Amino acid sequence: MDWTVREILNWTRGYFQGGGIGQPRLEAEILLAHSLNVDRLHLYLSPDKSLTQEERERFRAAIQRRHAGVPLQHLIGEVGFFGLRFRVGAGALVPRPETEELVERALALAPRERKIRCLDLGTGAGVIAVSLAKFLPNASVTAVDLSAEALELARENARSNGVSDRITFQESDWLRTVEGRYDLVVSNPPYVPEEEIDRLPVEVRDHEPRLAINGGKGGMERIEALTRDLGAHLHSGAAVLLEIGEGQGEAVAALFRQAGLTEVRVETDLSGRQRFVIGRCL
């Protein structure tokens, strides 16, 4: 049987709906366009095009993996973030829209009139570090992660976005081997409580690196480790911004104050949830 673009998209939408995928039509279009190596507009312009057997088999393999919980971004190998393109894979957390809000806040607080040093703790695929380097031409950035696999992915993303000359990548357990002081520190640390991980959606629980999501007991252990020696790495006037989990705002704000930060505040994301803690060094 020949399958046209229209027919296979309609069938896949139903298949994805049955699997509990939230945007079944959109994801079907994205995966089909990726499998055919065309953009989504091409699908609308050629709805009656028949797929070859090779194209059908390639698409079938992709939708079966998506139905089984493999993240869409892993299947297509990239994601858009803050207007840039990033390669993603199993070695690093898939960036979320909330982290774009974190970067937006960081850019708003960054000095522009002089050269500055920025620190991204737990860089993962490098989306924060690369975005800071791309939109702060006066900045040099240090990107830290404990995972060598994540750092390699981040290096590749720095190269593809043309900022590898201004980012230093460092393998470290938070600040343990980091030296010097910084003007801007940004982090999206693991903040999911360890006791809740088994209840996460399968695409997160089974396909995202545990190192990037497991925040330990209560989701606070990694954040506590991150903030413990923070004050020794800040220039006067430095801004610190962390992404946090729901219900963690006041506890993280208290850790900021213990680290000597002032002007500490908790801010909400676009959905109204407490998502960011921000402070400054005297």
Whereabouts are the PLM-identified features?
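Non-catalytic accessory regions of SAM-dependent methyltransferases
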Residues: 1-38, 42-44, 51
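Conserved hydrophobic residues forming the short capping helix/wall of the S-adenosyl-L-methionine
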Residues: 16, 110, 158, 230, ...
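Conserved AdoMet
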Residues: 30-108
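Residue-level signal for inorganic ion chemistry
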Residues: 31, 69, 99, 128, ...
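Conserved SAM/SAH cofactor-binding pocket of Class I
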Residues: 97-199, 225
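Helix-to-beta-strand junctions that scaffold the AdoMet/dcAdoMet cofactor pocket
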Residues: 163, 208, 234-236
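Mobile active-site "lid"/loop adjacent to the S-adenosyl-L-methionine
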Residues: 191-222
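Conserved Class I SAM-dependent methyltransferase catalytic core
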Residues: 217-280
